[in-house]
């Protein structure tokens, strides 16, 4: 079988990224990236898939090299506007923060993520199509593992596209909600498939691929954490079924991921407290492939490391001290005054107000060392055990297993915070019922850690046990996933309203500018203009901005 592509630059770019990532692991940010040998193996316009090794190389490039984290994080309630006097922004960031249709293109733009994911899907499809002709070259078990990885790559890319470019999945509305094209053949072109299937159809295809892949996927890779392994696949299944509102399956796959001793699988926050307390050291450790908590690591052309690092870059929209002290990391929490093992870092100066965890590294690959030009890079965990644990807690709450959910919440809390407190359903309910809801003031701009929840599934009345425990889950998961974009999907799933406001020079909310309500059309990122030009139906948009 032959790969034919009119965009060979994407193949070369992806090959360079993988080679760079492996060099990063081996040389610990030496930046002396040696990828010429790998690139020499790439063709100028076509590649014959005639061996199992060809398929393995294909699948290395079936993971997205662009990310949606930056767009998702800045569309969420994890950032505030620091005013028109702050010059550290761009038209792209302005569009993202205010939920406008994004016309600008860069490595983190929806257009690049869309194109990259569909390229990954085409690659996975080509691998699947090639395997049947290679049965005489290897064992059945190796072919099965390759098939499992290809199916997972195809399912994952579609899942990420659907969650960014569509409304949140609900079994009550999915049949009538626009999805994205599910590509099952390597030669397909999106322009040939302008009609968007329902979101229900897309999720059914994702589930089909996921269920077929789960018993097949293996761990026989040179660097396993950069590929789907069984644990990473279970974490994917857990998140998928959580978003599908299939709570028993979400809990089941989380348990398979975490094993019999979840505490041993979580991030080593206590060890990080003993490390050199620099951004470089801590962020490199955060994405360490030897950590049990990191299940699938992906490389990306991305500015996430500099945007959420100790820099002024794009600081007009920021997770600043007001958000941290009232809604997220530094706010009054159920554990009281107990400190984090590895806390946040605050930077405050003219046009700079950031409170951040040191997570994703800021890496730079020089294309021209003399001119000082090149690419922003980062490495990030697409799935972690810590997220899986909190996902299981949510599923257990929805199943009415409140004691087990409280046990999971305790595990997460005691791992990140220096406390011996053991949470119970009653302690959780009492704490969250003692907090006012966010935006309860006359101007609708002041913050607390508790927001009104408006999901389509039943969570009981406000103040009841189920609602209070979900407040705890969402509170903990918001801290856990800060700076990774995942909070945006909780906002969509739970119909959480977001108020856009301007923070004044005193660091307090002053001016209301916009509000995003449940099912606002802007919750679905607009289909990229190239796809719309080819005939793909755009997402609807509101006719006016609503006042609170």
Named regions from a protein language model:
Residues 34-83, 321-322, 326, 495-548:
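Membrane-proximal, proline-rich intrinsically disordered regions
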Residues 35-36, 231-270, 531-547:
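Aromatic-residue-lined binding/catalytic grooves and analogous aromatic/hydrophobic interfacial grooves
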Residues 93-166, 197, 212-218, 373-380, ...:
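Conserved, well-structured interaction surfaces
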Residues 121-124, 203, 210, 254, ...:
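Inward-facing hydrophobic residues that define packing positions of alpha-helical scaffold repeats
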Residues 251-386, 419-460, 480, 486, ...:
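Hydrophobic-face positions in mid-chain alpha helices that act as interaction patches
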């Amino acid at each position: 079988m032959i790969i034919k592509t009119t965009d060979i630059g994407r193949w070369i770019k992806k090959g360079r990224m993988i080679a760079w990532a492996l060099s990063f692991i081996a040389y610990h940010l030496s930046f002396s990236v040696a990828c010429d040998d790998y690139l020499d193996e790439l063709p100028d316009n076509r590649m014959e898939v005639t061996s199992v090794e060809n398929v393995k190389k294909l699948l290395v490039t079936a993971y997205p090299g662009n990310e949606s984290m930056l767009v998702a994080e800045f569309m969420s309630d994890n950032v505030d506007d620091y005013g028109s006097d702050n010059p550290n922004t761009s038209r792209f960031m302005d569009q993202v923060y205010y939920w406008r249709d994004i016309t600008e293109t860069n490595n983190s733009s929806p257009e690049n993520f869309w194109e990259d994911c569909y390229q990954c899907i085409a690659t996975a499809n080509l691998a699947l199509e090639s395997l049947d002709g290679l049965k005489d070259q290897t064992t059945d078990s190796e072919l099965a593992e390759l098939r499992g990885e290809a199916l997972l790559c195809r399912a994952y890319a579609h899942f990420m596209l659907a969650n960014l470019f569509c409304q949140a999945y609900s079994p009550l509305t999915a049949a009538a909600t626009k999805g994205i094209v599910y590509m099952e053949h390597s030669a397909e072109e999106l322009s040939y498939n302008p009609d968007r299937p329902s979101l229900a159809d897309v999720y059914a295809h994702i589930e089909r691929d996921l269920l077929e892949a789960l018993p097949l996927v293996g761990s026989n890779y040179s660097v396993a954490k950069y590929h789907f392994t069984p644990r990473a696949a279970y974490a994917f299944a857990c998140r998928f079924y959580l978003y599908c509102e299939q709570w028993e399956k979400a809990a089941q796959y989380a348990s398979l991921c975490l094993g019999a001793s979840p505490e041993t699988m979580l991030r080593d926050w206590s060890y990080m407290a003993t490390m050199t307390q620099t951004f470089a050291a801590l962020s490199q450790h955060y994405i360490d492939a030897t950590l049990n908590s990191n299940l699938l690591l992906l490389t990306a052309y991305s500015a996430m490391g500099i945007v959420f690092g100790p820099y002024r870059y794009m600081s007009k929209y920021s997770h600043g001290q007001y958000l941290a002290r009232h809604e997220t990391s530094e706010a009054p929490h159920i554990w009281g005054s107990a400190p984090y093992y590895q806390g946040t870092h605050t930077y405050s100066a003219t046009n700079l107000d950031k409170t951040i965890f040191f997570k994703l590294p800021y890496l730079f690959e020089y294309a021209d060392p003399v001119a000082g030009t090149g690419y922003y890079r980062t490495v990030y965990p697409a799935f972690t055990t810590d997220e899986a644990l909190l996902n299981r807690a949510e599923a257990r709450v929805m199943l009415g297993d409140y004691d087990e959910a409280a046990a999971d919440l305790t595990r997460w809390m005691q791992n990140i915070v220096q406390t011996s407190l053991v949470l119970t359903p009653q302690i959780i309910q009492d704490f969250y019922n003692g907090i006012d809801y966010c935006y309860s003031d006359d101007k609708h701009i002041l913050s607390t850690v508790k927001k009104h929840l408006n999901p389509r599934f039943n969570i009981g009345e406000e103040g009841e046990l189920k609602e209070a425990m979900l407040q705890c889950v969402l509170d903990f998961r918001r801290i856990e996933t800060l700076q990774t974009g995942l909070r945006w999907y909780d906002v969509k799933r739970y119909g959480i309203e977001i108020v856009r406001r301007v923070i004044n020079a005193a660091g307090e909310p002053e001016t209301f500018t916009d509000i995003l309500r449940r099912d606002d059309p802007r919750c679905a990122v607009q289909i990229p203009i190239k796809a719309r030009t080819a005939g793909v139906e755009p997402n609807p948009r509101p006719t006016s901005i609503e006042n609170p």
